[in-house]
Amino acid sequence: MKTYNYTLQYIDNIPYLIPFGQGISDHIPSILLNKTSVMIWDAINVYETNEEIVSHLIQTFQPDNENEKIELENDIKQFMKHLEMYNIFDNQSFHVLVPYKTKNIAFHIAGISMLYIGLESLFSENFAPFLSSEESMPEITIYTSLTLPHFKSVGTILVRSDDITICENDNEYIFIMNTYQYVKECHLSKDDTTCVLYHNELHPDDYKTAKEEVFHTIRFIFLYIAQRHNMFVIHSASILYKDKAWLFSASSGTGKSTHTTLWKNLYHTPCINGDLNLLAITDTHVEVRGIPWCGTSGISDNKTYPLGGIILLKQHPIDKIQPLTQAEKILYTMQRFISPTWTKEMVQKNLNAACFISKHAMITRLLCTKESSSAQLIHAEIDKYKEQ
């Protein structure tokens, strides 16, 4: 059982637990120990469970009768509870404190069942098409909480950017929202079952922005859970053409929405999602499943469609199809994913997914202008591919 924030030190032969690191920042006190509590402390650093610690100490102290044994057990548990108050040791639990009246809201996205427990006013209306009446047995429960825990979790930094810092410890992932005004942190348990969004105190004028921040913070969590289910989100705009989803992927400002508008005007194809699409890898094919996140386009869908292909757009003065090698198809597709890349294992998952997609769908690059001719060119290429 790992211990955090404290070190055992002797001051003039008297044992103390002295805080360090985050413990100092959280202003947690030093703790005076006696001989028994020193032995408990030593046992905590050796054994993995409460039961093992109690069993070891009972064997060490050898109580004379059952009453002494019970008294010793109670003393041990009381001392360990005292240590737990100061977040000193890892007891493999995930604490949730929600200090206000909450609303339970069940919703399903791409087959993942979720339960929101928090302020109803912070639950985005963008989730409306995904609401469910089934609250029991959610895969993940998402709480909102007014204040951060007094004792702040720390861990190994996986990602640090201007927007977000992601840390990991044995129990949880910690998302520190560097640029958000109201949502400050998000904690996700390592077993993927519990998530807590911590926000500042809110006034009436704050709720609109806070709701947006909660909506996008839940996206971070969903991306992680989806990847665990072999589902990956790609930055792209999508259309429905001949009963399949066709994705146009490019960086922001390259012309995804312009191109889907050309298709709509020329071929009357509806747009599925204006900015993000979820690719679900099955045993035999790839599906595009609806998600509520769609950038600023306001266009999303909750339905599922088979994937036809991915067209990688690049602005160019002349409309032209640029053939890609198999390796380029895989690499460029993976680079358009926004699924987590916090670890090399996550990168490998993304790479495997892109490899599968390249074998089961059309992937090509379109060098394009903003004229109708670009849509006509790739339309002909898609029809040619479908005839193969």
Residue ranges and their predicted role:
Residues N5, Q9-I24, S37, D64, ...:
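A noncatalytic interaction/capping subdomain that flanks phosphate/NTP-handling catalytic cores
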Residues T254-K256:
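Conserved glycine(s) of the Walker
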